[in-house]
Amino acid sequence: HSIGEFWRRWHITLGTWMKDYVFYPFSLSKAMNKLGKFFKKHSKTRFGKYMAKALPICLADLLIFFIVGVWHGAAWKYIVYGMYNGIIMSFSSIMAPVYEKMFKITHINKNARWYRGWQIIRTFILVNISWYFDNAATLTDAFRLMGNTFKHASFSMDAVVKMFGSQLDLIILLAGCLVWLIISILKEKGIVIREALDRKPLIIRWAVYIALVMSVAMLGYISNTSGGFMYAQF
């Protein structure tokens, strides 16, 4: 539903390391503590007092995503990729009180399906914009790709299949996305998949186990023939 939630789920190991060794040490440092006290002392408004707490967190987010950008590669496109995400997260933290006030004025129900759907669409768009910087050859190419998205927009199924390698690769990808979507919906509803599977008949459980083993074997073969581990260079 947000860039922050996306990153918490996207790269859990990297996120945990950054949280333990960068975020907490930086945001709780003496310098950030002094900065927070300075804002709290000289701010007379409620928003100013909120900034005393939010600013160290925002600066820590910017530092983390700068490091994440450099971790992806020593190039400007990766630095912009990291800072893009960091700025969005920091801006969201700063504007949180303003958003809450807007919700009260407009009487928007944040738990309504339409609003949650809007959050998903918004996050999907923001994340896909960041991929321009991650996937382009250079920073200049990233901005050129953005412009061409709107200037030369077209759709070709043959081009989509070619991008993923083969029709089989595309089918496997779509099947995986469908399974992922179903699992995500079940988790959002509070259903523990393992517990639900344990309540099923033995034949269904074994069918699922065999399907999982075959999927791992098949995907492992595909991975070995498609260029290896994508993070091997980092």
List each language-model region with its residue ranges:
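Non-catalytic, membrane-anchoring transmembrane segments at the edges
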Residues: 5-233
